[in-house]
Swiss-Prot record:
Its EC number is 1.11.1.7. Binds 2 calcium ions per subunit. Binds 1 heme b (iron(II)-protoporphyrin IX) group per subunit. It comes from Daucus carota. It catalyses: 2 a phenolic donor + H2O2 = 2 a phenolic radical donor + 2 H2O. GO terms for molecular function: lactoperoxidase activity; metal ion binding. Its cofactor is Ca(2+); heme b. Keywords: Calcium, Heme, Hydrogen peroxide, Iron, Metal-binding, Oxidoreductase, Peroxidase. This is Peroxidase 5. Belongs to the peroxidase family. Classical plant (class III) peroxidase subfamily.
Length: 17
């Protein structure tokens, strides 16, 4: 996973964990 999506902060949260 290269980074957060602009569409969803939730995606970033789960990807970082």
């Amino acid at each position: 996973y290269l980074g957060p999506t602009a569409d969803s902060t939730m995606d970033q949260t789960f990807a970082n964990n």
